[in-house]
Amino acid sequence: MKAKQSKEKIIKETLDTALEVGDVYCTRHSNLRDVQLVFHLVVDDTLQSADLSSRHPCLNGIRNIVRLTVRLGITSIHIPLLLVEQASENMTIAWCVRRAEMVYKCVKGYLMEVCGVCGGSAVGGGVTSVPHFNIHLVLPSGLADGVYQQISAMFPTIFHLVPSVSMAVQEP
């Protein structure tokens, strides 16, 4: 009888802890080429068309992913820049540029935050090494003409290119 109650309690707790928008979970992979770990960001359909603020749960999820990569020693990640998998008709050029700008600025802030935590000065006044991160910002295929050019032109104005920051174009 006690075992049955315990099992029912576990099932109830599992049902009560459903994933919400912005939650992140992680899976390990050994059969994917060059991928060992995948962070999954929980989103909903409103992300396809809604404007984002810096307080949106999905951007907080990206922040948690960046923080986890530092904690786990992961130095290379791919982030969908528009936070969508596929282009759709309602994604105007203006919408894409606004979304990209918001994600650019948030990712930059998250990187500055984690680099401030892990790249401070050492005891005795010496400088510790600052970690090197490769962030691949990916755009969905099928975007309107001119979107890629406008979004890539925005990159150096937000990240203020320095020798340690480079922008590479990779065609699918």
Regions found by a protein language model. Give the residues of each.
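Macrodomain-like recognition of ADP-ribose-binding/processing modules
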Residues: 1-172
